[in-house]
Amino acid sequence: GRTMKNGGIMTSRPFRSPHHTISDVALVGGGSYPQPGEISLSHNGVLFLDELPEFKRGVLEVLRQPLEDREVTISRAKFTVTYPSSFMLVASMNPSPSGYFNDPDAPVTSSPAEMQRYLSKISGPLLDRIDIHVEVTPVPFEKLSEERKGEPSNVIRERVTGARKVQSERFLEFSNIHYNAQMGVKQIRSYCKLDESSLQLLKTAMEKLNLSARAYDRILKVSRTI
């Protein structure tokens, strides 16, 4: 992350939310004298990309390798610089340009051509690197106006902290692995063993949904976390 103007060490994890007009250099880093980009400034924190399809496709594509390697290397004629970029990518988007896709009560819909242009900005390989996809449906007025109490943040924090502690203990012998998302193939085989029924369920999902080998590993990592 970036320290405050008055200096001092950081005491909380960074949260970066760049505008969709950002350039690829500003996102991953670079320049004549390379400077870290947003993906390095969000190292060990969260990189939030709001309205994902509004980013230029070329800008989004440069995320693919850093997401895989958790670092980014910038090469220039006389030197090469490597910056860390182990961040949690969180992105949001509307389901269509109008925002009302598949809503029978919506006054506006998008044509198939508009949908194709909109969704084509996000490539399959990039989506394949996002572990969890959640579709959020419209909330009716009755539920919005209800007086409901959600789960307190401190309770959620305790649960997350407990899960992270379990993972830290699990990977105590590894210097470069601290949580499930960082597992390599060997660790996945060791810590994500499936029984026969689970294996058959995963096999069926892989075949019916035409999932990739990368998706297979990520499903196991998320399952281990849950």
Protein language model features and the residues they cover:
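Basic, amphipathic alpha-helical bundle interface domains used for macromolecular binding and assembly
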Residues: 33-34, 57-226
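Switch I (G2) and immediately adjacent beta-strands of P-loop GTPase domains
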Residues: 16-26, 92
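Mechanochemical coupling/switch segment within NTP-driven translocation systems
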Residues: 2, 12-18
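Walker B catalytic acidic pair
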Residues: 44, 50-52, 62-63
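Residues immediately C-terminal
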Residues: 47-48, 54-55, 141
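Walker A/P-loop
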Residues: 1-7
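Conserved alpha-helical scaffold flanking the Walker A/P-loop in AAA+ ATPase domains
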Residues: 8-14, 25-47, 80
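Solvent-exposed alpha-helices and their adjacent loops that cap or buttress functional pockets
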Residues: 19-20, 39-41, 81-83, 126
